[in-house]
Amino acid sequence: MKICFVASECEPLVKVGGLGDVVQSLAKELVNLGHQVSVILPFYKSIKAQNVQFITQHTLNLGGVYYDFHIYKTNLDNVDIFLIDQKTFFGREYVYGTPKGPYEDNYLRFAFFSLASLETLSHVCHIPDIIHIHDWHTALVAVYKDLYFKHLDETATVLTIHNIAFQGIFLGHILPQIGIPWGLFNPEDLEFYNQVNFLKGGIVHSDVITTVSKTHAKEIQTNMGFGLEGVLREKRYVFGILNGIDTESWNPATDKSLYQNYDINTFKAGKEKNKMYVKELFGLETPHTRPLAAFIARLAKQKGLDLIEKAVDDAVKIGYDFIFLGSGDYYYQGKVLDMVKRNMGYVAARIEYNDILSRKLYAGADMFLMPSEYEPCGIGQMIAMRYGAIPIVHKTGGLADTVVDYNEDNEHGTGFSFEDYTYKDFLYTMARAMIVYQKKYIPEDNEWYNIVSNAMAQDFSWRRSVQEYIKIYKTAKLIKMH
């Protein structure tokens, strides 16, 4: 099949969140199976691609305004990457906005990108069997395709919702600026409480909808659909496919970032040495018997930082050390720094996104915190298990699908989870994990090590998930044929 991804992120060129990982990994796996895959991306200022080839220049009419743009091409892992270069929209320091908030003209930036992507795949790429769009940033591809690109009628559109909380909602008066007729401003289409909802438009106009875990596919059709549950329930084809991780890249046996490599047979010594190294790196001089809990994520309310902030002082008292790594909202950056000040010597933080440091931390941590309020899929808990850091998670979305709660009756557990999103439930679960962890220092007691072995043995590669996507693509093509 010929498949064209249209996305706002793709590792390693541009990554803000998990979307970049998914697009890169899925495209790579599809190519390995013999499919012809291309990816269309904005050519952000931050992209430092090598071997970039200029292809052509185009002019686009968007709402009566003409925009010139250039199309460039590169290739990564046998995937053709087409970069749309338009300096007004993408020649900025950040991808979506500054730390103070999103860019005010994001509606125009991503409407332009969606329309320019269709022009690109019409004139530069081979016309694909499938256009696979991702989140609200490219949801208008489905709308514009139905409106203006009749020669693509036989091409099916698949929309993956990675995070339904972000929908691209803007004031209704923008419609003329983005070249969409007022006839689509109705409750059956883009209108959403008298505003324009890009993601809703993508849902209505796409042939198949996917999201990133089976549990989350059910959740978004309930009151966890952020207002779009009714639209989703009306769609016949809504599927949940669990994301995978690139197990070649995320491999503690070969990861060059680690102080010492290890695998499922050598993790006892390997993780101990990495823990000593990472504690020294972050300036923690506490006894080595204290468990080290790591938080590696975007600093945002969704990620459960309110729960952690309430529980951290008590958790330190019962014997935990903490390391935070991530960037995000100024408010939560402040919260993290407050936790460090209150528990100096037991809690450390780096306010940055740093891939190499994150790898060191996965390897050195005993536990990995992901008490997310909601989590469509989550990649962090999969990487953590791969590196033998035991996840402590809220039982929601993809966390419910990937982490098996450990208890005395379930020897196959891979982590610890809690049902109610309260700090008391979270702290109780941390205490449960602590009790089992302390047994590692009892001779002949292998309970903790068994959990680590279970976690490291999990297969979170893309091999299984990519087969499900291929089935979805075939379903979408069949819908188009009928």
UniProtKB/Swiss-Prot annotation:
<dbReference type="GO" id="GO:0009011">
    <property type="term" value="F:alpha-1,4-glucan glucosyltransferase (ADP-glucose donor) activity"/>
</dbReference>
<keyword id="KW-0808">Transferase</keyword>
<comment type="pathway">
    <text>Glycan biosynthesis; glycogen biosynthesis.</text>
</comment>
<keyword id="KW-0328">Glycosyltransferase</keyword>
<dbReference type="InterPro" id="IPR013534">
    <property type="entry name" value="Starch_synth_cat_dom"/>
</dbReference>
<dbReference type="GO" id="GO:0005978">
    <property type="term" value="P:glycogen biosynthetic process"/>
</dbReference>
<feature type="binding site">
    <location>
        <position position="15"/>
    </location>
    <ligand>
        <name>ADP-alpha-D-glucose</name>
    </ligand>
</feature>
<dbReference type="GO" id="GO:0004373">
    <property type="term" value="F:alpha-1,4-glucan glucosyltransferase (UDP-glucose donor) activity"/>
</dbReference>
<comment type="function">
    <text>Synthesizes alpha-1,4-glucan chains using ADP-glucose.</text>
</comment>
<dbReference type="InterPro" id="IPR011835">
    <property type="entry name" value="GS/SS"/>
</dbReference>
<dbReference type="Pfam" id="PF00534">
    <property type="entry name" value="Glycos_transf_1"/>
</dbReference>
<protein>
    <recommendedName>
        <fullName>Glycogen synthase</fullName>
        <ecNumber>2.4.1.21</ecNumber>
    </recommendedName>
</protein>
<keyword id="KW-0320">Glycogen biosynthesis</keyword>
<dbReference type="Pfam" id="PF08323">
    <property type="entry name" value="Glyco_transf_5"/>
</dbReference>
<comment type="similarity">
    <text>Belongs to the glycosyltransferase 1 family. Bacterial/plant glycogen synthase subfamily.</text>
</comment>
<dbReference type="InterPro" id="IPR001296">
    <property type="entry name" value="Glyco_trans_1"/>
</dbReference>
